[in-house]
Design a protein with these regions (language model features):
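Catalytic-core regions of glycoside hydrolase
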Residues: 1-143, 148-150, 156, 164-186, ...
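Short amphipathic alpha-helical coiled-coil/interface segments
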Residues: 139-143, 193-196, 218-221, 225-229, ...
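Amphipathic alpha-helical protein-interaction segments enriched in hydrophobic
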Residues: 162-166, 209-234, 249-252, 275
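C-terminal substrate/ligand-recognition segments
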Residues: 179-201, 215-237
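C-terminal amphipathic alpha-helical "assembly" element
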Residues: 197-198, 204, 218, 233, ...
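Short, solvent-exposed, charged loop/turn and helix-capping segments
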Residues: 200-213, 261-277
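Extended, compositionally biased alpha-helical segments that mediate assembly or anchoring
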Residues: 320-360
């Protein structure tokens, strides 16, 4: 994927096909607007328009719905379009944001660019089996907010949930290299979730709807968590003990609420992840090893050197039932207790987060 020009310049056309690995954000096919612009693209070689979308398998609504449509047809209609041979998925983690993968795989079948909103209306009918104006409006609202990541934004996947962050005085991104930015109004997500909830009874038993409902409500709770955490920060800075306790308690309740919500779907349960890992083992020892690997991958990534100095802790974090209550809640409760002691004027040692993370 994305080979250097010197590597492919002397190869004959037809000898290879190149994957433009991150085409939805940093295309190299020859788009002058790209930060990874290559004047000659991939030369005479065939290439694939790929969407990376997700890093680390992190959970969260994210995408560039309109941009993916526009960028694909921009490439197709350019001089480089004659060697464009299809689309590809290069995500690090799947089983998230199905709307984006549905859109991507439909592009090659549509000879001309199409209207995003009309496509979404048809998508909801195909996905849920019937037309509902409220559902369609909810999805269009999402497409104009959290699924409307700016063209030039190169963040590594989802706008990460603050629940999953290792606590600090000013927590923002969860993984070390996410480069995420606040590009949408969280209240739009909260409104879209309320719209989906308002018609949920009409879709009872509809697996696709119920999956999306949980995922969208999950995102709304995460947005409320981020808004609440900002109140916690402000209360600590002001030395307001009462507000700090009220806001931090509310934040912890939101984590538990999120955990309870996600228990309703196997796709959002850490137990599903661990059970799958254990099922690959042929002996009791292998099962234990695979479970250990599954747990480490989504938390510390490895030893203290990898987690802290290497910055790899939480790279593959998951906002899932089970780990929210047993891991992320523990971290935040430890942090709030620590800051409460500081507000009370008590001397307290700095928290060794790795020491409390590793046993999980």
């Amino acid at each position: 994927a994305n080979p250097r020009p010197q590597m492919i310049g002397n190869l004959e056309a037809g000898d290879l096909i190149v994957l433009d690995l991150f085409a939805e954000s940093r295309p190299q096919w020859g788009d002058p607007a790209s930060t990874w612009y290559r004047k000659d693209g991939f030369g005479q070689h065939d290439w694939i328009y790929c969407m990376l979308l997700n890093y680390g398998g992190n959970v969260g609504l994210h995408g560039k719905l309109k941009h993916v449509i526009d960028e694909f047809y921009k490439a197709k209609e350019s001089p480089f379009g004659k060697t464009l041979k299809g689309v590809g998925m290069t995500m690090e983690g799947s089983e998230n944001n199905p709307v984006m993968f549905e859109l991507l795989t439909e592009l090659p079948w549509c000879p001309q660019r199409f209207d995003k909103d009309q496509w979404l209306r048809e998508y909801t009918v195909a996905r849920y089996g019937k037309s509902n104006p409220t559902v369609q409006d909810a999805w269009i609202l999402l497409s104009n907010s959290i699924y409307n990541c700016p063209d030039a934004n190169t963040q590594q996947g989802t706008h990460e949930s603050v629940f999953c962050a290792r606590p600090t005085e000013h927590p923002y991104q969860v993984s070390s290299w996410s480069e995420m930015k606040d590009y949408y109004d969280p209240n739009d997500v909260i409104r879209a979730a309320a719209m989906m909830v308002s018609v949920a009874d009409e879709f009872k038993g509809n697996n696709n709807f119920e999956y999306d409902l949980v995922d969208i409500v999950r995102q709304a709770i995460a947005e409320k968590g981020r808004l609440t955490e900002k109140v916690v920060e402000a209360a600590f800075a002001a030395g307001d003990k009462k507000l700090y306790k009220d806001a931090s308690d509310r934040f912890l309740r939101l984590i538990l609420l999120q955990d309870e919500l996600l228990a309703t779907r196997p796709e959002f349960k850490v137990g599903t992840w661990i059970a799958r890992a254990r099922s690959l083992g042929g002996t009791p020892e292998e099962k234990e090893l695979y479970e250990w690997n599954a747990r480490v991958q989504i938390t510390t990534w490895g030893n203290r050197l990898a987690a802290d100095e290497g910055g790899l802790r939480d790279y593959a974090h998951r906002e899932w039932n089970g780990i929210l209550k047993d891991f992320y809640y523990m971290r935040w409760k430890t942090w709030f207790d620590y800051q409460t002691r500081l507000l009370d004027g008590k001397k307290t040692a700095a928290i060794d987060f790795y020491a409390i993370e590793e046993p999980w």
